[in-house]
């Protein structure tokens, strides 16, 4: 993290709320543009950092900052939506805490989809699978007639997943429909499974994945409401079926069962998570290469990465000196 990029007033805060959220609720052009203009102002006034995607189908984001300021952004979103009694009409929020900023800036971006599956007919506001609360998840996945599917990408599943879950080994969520047709459908026929149980980080990908499977006649489809993050928040570790850490899309990289930063860090060359043990390998050079990308880049690339890392290290040293002088 580059401390010089942090918003004023955040650098010394010791406890920041991190809120991951989404809502599938229709937004017309006017309401979408209003959000795109109002959110940055509200975030700046409250020292809130993060990223929010805004589309005609709804919003998807993760933000961090002082609790009252984050709650003000969430309340603003709620009042901007037509939240009724339909299954999709809610702002799904997962809360965790951080000791330092996990984003460098705030961005609100206009998108075609808030999570991209690339199938125009998929609409969670029309059809989704059966929601499963975290407290009931263990009973569902323990049933031998349940086929458990991890809808996340391979770099996420590599550092943690639920016991017995099937890994589609996808590089992008766009790959899920093709995997479902080429691999999942034959697998269901082979195993004679009675139901599918799906999960993802916060629940949003399962909204679209379950909608797709419902459309394509895959039978009984269930998905974990609130995703892995809600499960880790509500289920005691002693009763948990979760193994490993949960990858998150901010500077914490991965969370353990206590929703605290885990042992993984990002390789800034390739952007993939690297465990503490993997950082001890001879192939690992901080900021330059890891076991995932040791043969991926040219010597010129690695020299450029090394120069960038030296600049980052120097800025951190300078910031540390400033903090000591101010302290």
From Swiss-Prot:
Its EC number is 1.14.-.-. Keywords: Oxidoreductase, tRNA processing. Transmembrane segments: none annotated. Coiled coil: none annotated. It is an enzyme of class 1 (oxidoreductase). The active site is at 200 (cysteine persulfide intermediate). One of its GO terms (molecular function) is oxidoreductase activity, acting on paired donors, with incorporation or reduction of molecular oxygen. Residues 142-240 form the Rhodanese domain. The keyword Cytoplasm does not apply. Catalyzes oxygen-dependent 5-hydroxyuridine (ho5U) modification at position 34 in tRNAs. This is tRNA uridine(34) hydroxylase.
